[in-house]
From Swiss-Prot:
Species of the source: Proteus mirabilis (strain HI4320)
Catalysis: reaction(s): [thioredoxin]-disulfide + sulfite + adenosine 3',5'-bisphosphate + 2 H(+) = [thioredoxin]-dithiol + 3'-phosphoadenylyl sulfate
Record-stated family: Belongs to the PAPS reductase family. CysH subfamily.
Protein name (database record): Phosphoadenosine 5'-phosphosulfate reductase
Any one GO CC term of the record: cytoplasm
Function according to Swiss-Prot or TrEMBL: Catalyzes the formation of sulfite from phosphoadenosine 5'-phosphosulfate (PAPS) using thioredoxin as an electron donor.
InterPro entries: PAPS/APS_Rdtase, PAPS_reduct_dom, PAPS_reductase_CysH, Rossmann-like_a/b/a_fold
Classification via Pfam families: PAPS_reduct
Keywords: Cytoplasm, Oxidoreductase
Nucleotidyltransferase found in the keyword field: no
Keyword Cytoplasm set for record: yes
């Protein structure tokens, strides 16, 4: 089977594109995570990248991908507001997994943003979305362009939130192929993989955090809360990168 061509797919009608991807996804649903990665490396365009927020379970996808493609560029969008433990976790995994880390940031610093706009994350859903556009979406778009990405791997999982429960393994996002190798994994599989390969959870896992982003929009999980409610004051789940 030849490599999938995005240029050929975009010539198809929307319905034909959907049908083509549906057929492929039916096959990918039957594969294991590692088989999906191997399939993608063999059949998708070969400017590969992996994005990571270095969140609670980030070590899984970082290990899974780099064992098959050691030099894959790993994109981090750094807002400047990550937890100190997150920066330490980034350093730890970059060293232990020998990551080819590529860090992208907003064009203006976090302090300058606050001087210009105030604390956007306290300005309701519109403020949060503007903050995400400046600090997450725009840097990611720059990364994908500069790295000439044709295939984008990410560690999203259906179990993480209602907004993710119908995600396909393979899709087209931001004009490139996007593959989610562990999309159907549950928390038990995550735990087993980390244990099997002697990989760490994010340090804040032990303190009761289920999901970790910026210090100002991340809450520790409490009884009765959903995972979605631990981020962005429960107003939204996604930071804009995967919407």
């Amino acid at each position: 089977m030849s490599r999938l061509s995005l240029s050929q797919l975009v010539l198809l009608s929307i319905e034909e594109q959907r049908l083509a991807l549906d057929e492929i996804n039916q096959q990918l649903e039957q594969k294991t995570a590692i088989e999906r990665v191997i399939w993608a490396l063999e059949h998708l365009p070969n400017q590969f990248v992996l994005s990571s927020s270095f969140g609670i379970q980030a070590a899984v996808c970082l290990h899974l991908l780099t064992r098959q493609y050691p030099d894959i560029p790993v994109i981090l969008t750094d807002t400047g507001y990550l937890f100190p433990e997150t920066y330490q976790f980034i350093d730890e995994l970059t060293s232990s997994l020998q990551l080819n880390l590529k860090v992208y940031r907003a064009e203006i610093s976090s302090s300058w943003q606050e001087a210009r706009y105030g604390k956007l994350w306290l300005q309701g859903i519109e403020g949060i979305e503007r903050y995400n556009q400046i600090n997450k979406v725009a840097p990611m778009e720059k990364a994908l362009k500069e790295l000439q990405a044709k295939t984008w791997f990410a560690g999203l999982r259906r179990q993480q939130s209602k907004s993710r429960e119908h995600l396909p393994v393979l899709s087209i996002a931001k004009g490139i192929f996007k593959l989610l190798p562990i999309v159907d994994w549950d928390n038990k599989q995550i735990y087993q993989y980390l244990k099997q390969h002697n990989l760490p959870y994010h340090p804040l896992w032990e303190q009761g955090y289920l999901s970790v982003g910026d210090t100002h929009t991340t809450r520790k999980w409490q009884e009765g809360m959903s995972e979605e409610e631990t981020r962005f004051f429960g107003l939204k789940r996604e930071c804009g990168l995967h919407e």
